[in-house]
């Protein structure tokens, strides 16, 4: 099996294993993170109602000032932006869902930026 295919299968197994254990509510939504080679996305999800409360990514208009969207600086920008959106909706605590990705690099940078901006997790 090709190395990239094996890495994807491993990530999906990790994702399913973790997703069984965490649930977001309206008071404490799930902060879901997804990264691709060029972009990073974050969502606040209420699993009990099945709705997305807030979302942002490097594709949003506030990220147009970034020269490159697939690096740690872009992840920090998205982390601060999602924390700001959460504050607007009076959300202070979240459950962090790294979506099967390792807690390293861009995922860690987004989480740290969200914590510095006031989100508790």
UniProtKB/Swiss-Prot annotation:
One of its GO terms (molecular function) is structural constituent of ribosome. Keywords: Ribonucleoprotein, Ribosomal protein, RNA-binding, rRNA-binding. One of its GO terms (cellular component) is cytosolic large ribosomal subunit. Gene3D superfamilies: 3.30.420.100. GO terms for biological process: translation. It comes from the Bacteria. Pfam families: Ribosomal_L18p. InterPro entries: Ribosomal_uL18_bac-type, Ribosomal_uL18_bac/euk. The keyword Cytoplasm does not apply. Belongs to the universal ribosomal protein uL18 family. This is one of the proteins that bind and probably mediate the attachment of the 5S RNA into the large ribosomal subunit, where it forms part of the central protuberance. Part of the 50S ribosomal subunit; part of the 5S rRNA/L5/L18/L25 subcomplex. Contacts the 5S and 23S rRNAs. This is Large ribosomal subunit protein uL18.
């Amino acid at each position: 099996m090709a190395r990239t295919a094996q890495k994807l299968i491993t990530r999906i197994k990790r994702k399913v294993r973790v997703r069984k254990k965490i649930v977001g509510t309206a008071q404490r939504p799930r902060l879901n993170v997804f990264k691709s080679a060029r972009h990073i996305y974050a969502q606040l999800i209420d699993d009990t109602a099945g709705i997305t409360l807030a979302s942002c990514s490097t594709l949003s208009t506030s990220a147009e000032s970034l020269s490159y969207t697939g690096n740690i600086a872009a992840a920090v920008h998205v982390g601060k932006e999602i924390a700001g959106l959460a504050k607007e909706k009076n959300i202070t605590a979240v459950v962090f869902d790294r979506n099967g990705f390792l807690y390293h690099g861009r995922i860690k940078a987004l989480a740290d930026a969200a914590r510095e901006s006031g989100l508790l997790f």
